[in-house]
């Protein structure tokens, strides 16, 4: 039976969002009378404020620079519908199913903070979309990250009123048709509900949750690959000695060194004379590269999770003090900072693995391993092993590195210069995912190469099998899915299979 995540009953974590995205947990909305009163009190206060004095942005006025347009009361109900319609201009690929679930979960949780002036009924229908896996088709391109993710989130807002297409049971269908089939009633917006859904950071925040989770595993896997290559290269295990890292006590640096050290079985390694007293930087300094993620992870998590558990639309409706605040909480600067930082660290890990890959296939540096790790028992001149794969690794790494320019510096004035400073957080998050995709490809290739190198050393009796004691699970997992490379063959499918296993966090780290 699946664990249940209850929205409205405490704070969500990155792990909660990822679990919802992957359908590893069930989702419920807090149904207590107290929570329902908390949410509905915001919508009721907004109605009262509207009746008393009017003049509420996005309710009685146009949007953005058009806020000087004051609407007659008979147009109030049509305004939010128009908002969803004219923002239906996104382009690019649609977000995948996992990311779409994450977007809905994040927006649901931010609206559940009780400062958005929405009804409990709105939260309920978004929950029903999640529970029934009704997934709005949300284009990835078109958000500048302030006012939030207006265009992407318009596809969620439009879907709950029956005006957008969704994916349901693998088919593209009208949301109205799917809701009728399931006995659901399309939502009827109250005054601020469309802008409450749209004017926030849920798309970039959801992508950030997915990116953080992938980067965390990739960092762990990079430590494991480094340990495998250190053994295969007959490297100096004492580059990762605990006492050494007490002299420079960055916690993440020490943690990375420990993860590498734990793979090396130092009880055996201490009796092995390394080929050189000092290995190249791509081995010796690996903890200093990978450890940057561990040292920054708490800060990145804080940025992502505070945003996740905040009200981030405009205006903020506070029924508790009976105030309506016009501000800029839709600005995605914190997520942009997190993603600009994370993509830089991930790309550096790819660059590290690229250097390790280049070293282990090159007979000038790989300490008597065969050229390109060709595993044939006879002549090496026909077989070229991982030669082309290493070229691919260079290409993937270069592509990842060129995406590390921070997106925040590309802010553009837009929307009649009302949105004259914007975050670009959504593009930063999407860039981070692309950097992760490329870096995972680098890791897949390097993992296979490191396992091949270890196998060759073992077959030649050049290393003791006990050296692999702490790496055996990962080593066995590789060869359970990957036939050793003895003669040249196409490796594309092997790489794709390994990539999917990495993304499912299959390998022991």
At which residue positions do the language-model features occur?
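Polyanion/phosphate-binding surface patch
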Residues: 54, 69, 256-257
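Catalytic or ion-translocation cores adjacent to nucleophile or general acid/base/metal-coordination motifs
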Residues: 73-88, 359-372
């Amino acid at each position: 039976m699946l664990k249940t995540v209850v929205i409205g009953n405490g704070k969500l974590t990155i792990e909660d969002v990822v679990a919802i995205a992957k359908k590893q947990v069930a989702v419920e909305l807090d149904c207590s009378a107290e929570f329902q009163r908390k949410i509905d009190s915001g919508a009721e206060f907004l109605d009262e404020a509207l009746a008393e004095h009017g003049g509420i942005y996005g309710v009685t006025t146009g949007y953005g620079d058009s806020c000087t347009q004051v609407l007659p009361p008979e147009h109030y109900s049509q305004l939010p519908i128009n908002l969803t319609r004219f923002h239906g201009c996104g382009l690019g690929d649609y977000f995948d199913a996992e990311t779409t679930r994450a977007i809905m979960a994040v927006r649901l949780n931010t609206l559940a903070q009780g400062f958005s002036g929405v009804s409990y009924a709105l939260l309920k229908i978004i929950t029903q979309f999640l529970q029934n896996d009704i997934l709005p088709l949300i284009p990835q391109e078109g958000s500048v990250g302030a006012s939030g993710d207006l265009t992407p989130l318009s596809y969620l807002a439009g879907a709950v009123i029956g005006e957008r297409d969704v994916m349901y049971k693998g088919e593209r269908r009208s949301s109205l048709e799917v809701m009728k089939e399931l006995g659901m009633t399309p939502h009827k917006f109250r005054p601020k509900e469309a802008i409450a859904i749209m004017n926030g950071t849920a798309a970039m925040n959801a992508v950030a949750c997915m990116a953080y989770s992938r980067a965390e595993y990739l960092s762990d896997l990079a430590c494991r690959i480094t340990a495998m290559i250190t053994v295969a290269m007959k490297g100096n295990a004492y580059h990762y000695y605990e006492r050494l890292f007490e002299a420079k006590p960055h916690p993440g640096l020490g943690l990375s060194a420990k993860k590498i050290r734990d793979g090396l079985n130092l009880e055996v390694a201490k009796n092995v004379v390394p080929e050189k007293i000092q290995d190249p930087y791509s081995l010796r300094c690996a903890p200093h590269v990978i450890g940057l993620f561990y040292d920054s992870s708490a800060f990145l998590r804080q940025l992502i999770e505070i945003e996740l558990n905040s009200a981030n639309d405009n205006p903020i409706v506070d029924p508790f003090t009976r105030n309506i605040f016009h501000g800029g909480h839709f600005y995605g600067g914190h997520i942009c900072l997190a993603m600009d930082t994370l993509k830089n660290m991930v790309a550096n890990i790819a660059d590290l693995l690229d250097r390790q890959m280049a070293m282990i296939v090159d007979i000038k540096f790989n300490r008597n391993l065969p050229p390109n790790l060709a595993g044939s028992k006879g002549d090496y001149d026909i077989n070229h092993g991982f030669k082309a794969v290493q070229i691919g690794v260079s290409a993937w790494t270069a592509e990842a590195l060129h995406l590390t320019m921070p997106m925040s510096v590309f802010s553009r004035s837009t929307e009649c210069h009302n949105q004259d400073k914007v975050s670009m957080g959504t593009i930063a998050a999407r860039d981070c995912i692309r950097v992760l995709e490329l870096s995972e490809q680098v890791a897949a290739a390097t993992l296979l190469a490191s396992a091949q190198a270890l196998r060759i050393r073992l077959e030649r009796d050049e290393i003791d099998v006990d050296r692999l004691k702490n790496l055996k699970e990962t080593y066995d997992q590789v060869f359970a899915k990957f036939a050793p490379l003895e003669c040249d063959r196409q490796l594309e499918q092997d790489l794709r299979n390994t990539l999917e296993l990495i993304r499912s966090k299959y390998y022991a780290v």
